[in-house]
Amino acid sequence: MKNEKKKSGIEPKVFFPPLIIVGILCWLTVRDLDAANVVINAVFSYVTNVWGWAFEWYMVVMLFGWFWLVFGPYAKKRLGDEKPEFSTASWIFMMFASCTSAAVLFWGSIEIYYYISTPPFGLEPNSTGAKEIGLAYSLFHWGPLPWATYSFLSVAFAYFFFVRKMDVIRPSSTLVPLVGEKHAKGLFGTIVDNFYLVALIFAMGTSLGLATPLVTECMQWLFGIPHTLQLDAIIITCWIILNAICVACGLQKGVRIASDVRSYLSFLMLGWVFIVSGASFIMNYFTDSVGMLLMHLPRMLFYTDAIGKGGFPQGWTVFYWAWWVIYAIQMSIFLARISRGRTVRELCFGMVMGLTASTWILWTVLGSNTLLLMDKNILNIPQLIEQHGVARAIIETWAALPLSTATMWGFFILCFIATVTLINACSYTLAMSTCREVRDGEEPPLLVRIGWSVLVGIIGIVLLALGGLKPIQTAIIAGGCPLFFVNIMVTLSFIKDAKVHWKDK
């Protein structure tokens, strides 16, 4: 009994350092919000301007890695001895479900406005050229390129899981082939794990910081409850309590059902927007945007605007590449676990095709709807953002649709469920990563899960208190920097080990 307790307890070397670091940063921020904003702007400017090029090269190199996996010597290697655990249709659907978070609904609805109002390549704001490139850039940031980078890491984790039979819950476990067991399980591995956990905590906090205002703005629209920071804090607290109840009462099956409901409701809501917003325009705009993407792809890949210094690639491309980097390990572990029994080529093609289709549908439908509302002068989005904030502008893009009350109820339920499942996933992932010897099928300790959900909630509230998108963007970029190196090490470790255990034929 005593040994069992020790077995399922926290791992101090990866539990306390992230807790202390994040706690201190939150305390310093709350002490002086104005000073924190000054630091945030300085960090954002330094990382994006000095190191933005590194993120762009990272994505390009990982894209070449994808081609190597698909057409190279390992293409037909199978990730595990068993047949695929899920049918291809179920597999693709699970991938789509992983894309329908509230943060995705946030960016999908409003991103195009920023691209049109502050366009790249020196284009005139709100011009025809800016509108033509707007959706194309969304398809670039949320298309095959980032999913190709994820597929490389997913193959790496699937290899360690199902071929090498390793129990990987932290990135240091995968580094044994690269740095040796002594370093992977020693101080070096501990530092790597702590980088991963601190970055992941901030990433999850930013997702919560994006999702919460959508729910509270829905409540204001539906029930007339004024949206305030206090209301945001109350809603986050309610979610944390709900998550604790679900975990304590063994209602995880209910959470999984809620996740399925979220996916089906996403299909329903997107279908509704597609039909009533203007299906023919959406398809024409999408087709045109794919052409624009293909025409400008080389420049987009390497665009740093070093001469014009307009700030577009730093504010968006580097930010999104950091977003993809920071979520890469967590997402790739999930995608690897549902891909047992598939070949390397199947996993790479399935991810790029299935997940690109998911994100392109989301961004095309929601972005086109926002553009139409702007062009028809139904919404004055700049005024809404200036007077009420970004979340209100997003809500109004949904409220402007026919049957607005029913539409808003659907959007409210979708955002609420998406955030409940987000907090549940956050607490589970962090608890699994900071506990000792928790195996698949076992639950990490209740108090640890609740503790992490509380900390993620606090970060979300702190980011909301800072106001605007810049703190959220900076948190992602700062967290993405250390993960940039961790992802590269995991990739190199896989390549080195595969050369031994998957000998070229």
From Swiss-Prot:
Catalysed conversion reaction: 4-(trimethylamino)butanoate(in) + (R)-carnitine(out) = 4-(trimethylamino)butanoate(out) + (R)-carnitine(in)
Keyword annotations for this protein, in alphabetical order, are:
Antiport, Cell inner membrane, Cell membrane, Membrane, Transmembrane, Transmembrane helix, Transport
User: Any idea which GO molecular function terms this record carries?
Assistant: (R)-carnitine:4-(trimethylammonio)butanoate antiporter activity; transmembrane transporter activity
Q: What pathway, per the record? A: Amine and polyamine metabolism; carnitine metabolism
Q: Which GO terms describe its biological process?
A: 4-(trimethylammonio)butanoate transport; carnitine metabolic process
Record keyword Cell membrane present: yes
Residues that span the membrane, as ranges: 10-30, 51-71, 92-112, 143-163, 195-215, 231-251, 263-283, 316-336, 347-367, 403-423, 446-466, 475-495
Q: Which NCBIfam families match?
A: bcct, PRK03356.1
| Name of the protein in its database record | L-carnitine/gamma-butyrobetaine antiporter
Task: Provide the species name.
Answer: Salmonella typhimurium (strain LT2 / SGSC1412 / ATCC 700720)
